[in-house]
């Protein structure tokens, strides 16, 4: 059972540019949410000051009490663990089905939706709030695995390092632009608009990713026989 490759009607240069644009899109999350703005916001809204002037950084999650930074680390750690455990199997299934682009879209939209969901972050309802962060982080890092899997399809091996470096550069500049815009909003208008930065990042991520989705080559394959999960393990075993 072979693949049929559908090449979008773009030049190779345009296809490579489309690939690099996912760095431009995804980089906004990696800088604004994981590094620059959200950690400060999270610490501010989960720290309370008592009437006597005492400061508490304790939060309640699923009935358990945690230090706010401790819970933050646990949630991010759990999201990375899910990506580490699930990505190899999902990659095998995607290769077997010829659906890398579908998986890339799914993780992208999951991450962008989680990012937008942070707008409604509520320290009194951390179960929902931290779920949004969890989904955003799984989407961000999970999508990069499928994004990188396109590299051998759009460029020869000798161009991979250069193309990856260019993609990283695009991601860096894109993330700086959205960070400056968000900081201009927060510092120029007011800190009460910080939450809007999370919506802007989610829309930026999902919006610019459309360039990548339109330009990547598509592989389609006849519907496979047998158990899909088992076939995913077989593909993974073959790679290993």
Question: Each predicted region: which residue ranges?
Answer:
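Hydrophobic core of transmembrane alpha-helices in multi-pass small-molecule transporters
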Residues: 107-121, 125-143
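Glycine-rich segments within core transmembrane alpha-helices of 12-TM secondary carriers
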Residues: 161-186
């Amino acid at each position: 059972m072979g693949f049929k490759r559908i090449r979008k009607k773009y030049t190779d240069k345009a296809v490579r540019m489309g690939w690099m644009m996912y760095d431009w899109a995804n980089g906004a999350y990696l800088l604004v949410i994981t590094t620059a703005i959200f950690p400060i916001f999270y610490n501010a809204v989960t720290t309370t000051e008592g009437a006597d002037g005492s400061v508490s950084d304790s939060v309640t999650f699923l009935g358990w009490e945690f230090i706010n930074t401790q819970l933050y680390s646990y949630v991010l750690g759990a999201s990375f663990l899910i990506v580490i455990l699930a990505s190899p199997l999902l990659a095998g299934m995607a290769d077997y089905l010829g659906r890398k682009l579908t998986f890339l879209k799914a993780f992208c939209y999951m991450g962008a939706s989680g990012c937008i969901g942070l707008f409604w972050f509520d320290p009194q309802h951390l179960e929902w709030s931290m779920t949004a962060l969890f989904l955003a982080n799984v989407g961000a890092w999970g999508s990069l695995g499928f994004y990188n899997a396109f590299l051998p399809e759009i460029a020869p091996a000798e161009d991979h390092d250069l193309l990856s470096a260019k993609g990283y550069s695009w991601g860096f500049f894109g993330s700086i632009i959205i960070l400056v815009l968000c900081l201009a909003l927060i510092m120029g208008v007011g800190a009460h608009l910080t939450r809007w930065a999370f919506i802007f990042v989610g829309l930026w991520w999902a919006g610019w990713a459309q360039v990548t989705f339109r330009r990547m080559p598509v592989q389609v394959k006849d519907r496979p026989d047998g158990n899909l999960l088992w076939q995913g393990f077989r593909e993974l075993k073959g790679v290993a």
